[in-house]
Amino acid sequence: MDKIFLLSFDDGTVWDRRFVELLNKYGMKATFNLNSGLEDFIWYYEDRFPIRRQKLADTVEQYRFHEIASHTLTHPYMSELPEWELMRQMGDDKRNLESLFCREVKGFAVPFSYYSDL
């Protein structure tokens, strides 16, 4: 029996370059959950570890053999948003990613794993 496991990486950070290199080397695939509204953005994990996001236009070739999934435009806490903003965050991100990567985006990952029942 074949065994399957899923690898997913969030936010499109510069570290993805190395992950993709290793995945490609060993013939493995992963899902990359991206935010189209936070390109070339730095944020600090626990106020001390800088995390830099890549410019998405620079990643089209990098992610060529992997799944791209939506992760909202700006990585908000979705449980705090009104319904109209939830729809905008998800819909605009999906459309932006499909336009940039020229393929259908089917997956979605909730930022911070917090969501609303709306």
How would you label these PLM feature ranges?
Residues 11-14, 84:
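A generic structural signal for alpha-helix starts
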Residues 26-118:
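Metal-dependent polysaccharide deacetylase catalytic core of the NodB/CE4 family, i.e.
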Residues 1-6, 14-18, 25, 48-58:
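N-terminal pre-catalytic segment of deacetylase/amide-hydrolase enzymes
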Residues 6-7, 67:
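Hydrophobic "anchor" residues on beta-strands that sit immediately upstream
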Residues 19-20, 80:
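Hydrophobic alpha-helical membrane-insertion segments
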Residues 9-12, 72:
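Active-site metal-binding loops of divalent metal-dependent hydrolases
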